């Protein structure tokens, strides 16, 4: 079971990802939100994760793969499709979508 949760802001012009750590029944933010495509959110998260020796390498791979899947999915959608968010939690059950526009 992962001790981390990826949180996404699903926006029309960008998608952002932040990382929280599970502590008991609660979560606490570990990172700020990294935005795509204004910046390279994936690369920024990769650099952050690689600098943290307390995050297991296998966990890093899983988190980066999940980020890749969500960003790729976001990029494939038209602006109209990006507004239809009802299916996101089904498609990506291991992440949390915390904001939309």
Swiss-Prot record:
Biological processes, Gene Ontology terms: translation
What keywords appear on the UniProt entry? Chloroplast, Plastid, Ribonucleoprotein, Ribosomal protein
Q: Membrane spanning segments where?
A: none
Tell me which domain of life the UniProt entry assigns to the organism this sequence originates from: Eukaryota
Where in or outside the cell it occurs: the entry states: Plastid, Chloroplast
Q: A single GO CC term, please?
A: ribosome
Q: Which InterPro entries match?
A: PSRP-3/Ycf65_sf, Ribosomal_PSRP3/Ycf65
GO MF, any single term? structural constituent of ribosome
Gene3D superfamilies for the chain: 3.30.390.140
Family label:
Belongs to the chloroplast-specific ribosomal protein cS23 family.
User: What is the annotated quaternary arrangement, including any partners?
Assistant: Part of the 30S ribosomal subunit.
Its biological purpose is as follows: Probably a ribosomal protein or a ribosome-associated protein.
In its UniProt entry, what is this protein called?
Small ribosomal subunit protein cS23
Q: Which organism is it from?
A: Euglena stellata
Task: Name the encoding gene, please.
Answer: ycf65
């Amino acid at each position: 079971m992962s001790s981390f949760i990826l949180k996404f802001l699903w926006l029309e012009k960008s998608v952002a990802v932040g990382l929280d750590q599970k502590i008991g029944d609660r979560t606490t933010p570990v990172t700020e939100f990294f935005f795509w495509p204004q910046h390279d959110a994936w690369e920024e998260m990769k650099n952050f994760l690689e600098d943290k020796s307390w995050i297991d390498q296998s966990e890093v791979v899983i988190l980066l793969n999940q980020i890749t899947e969500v960003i790729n999915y976001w990029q494939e959608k038209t602006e109209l499709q990006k507004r239809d968010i009802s299916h996101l939690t089904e498609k990506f059950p291991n992440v949390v979508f915390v904001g939309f526009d």
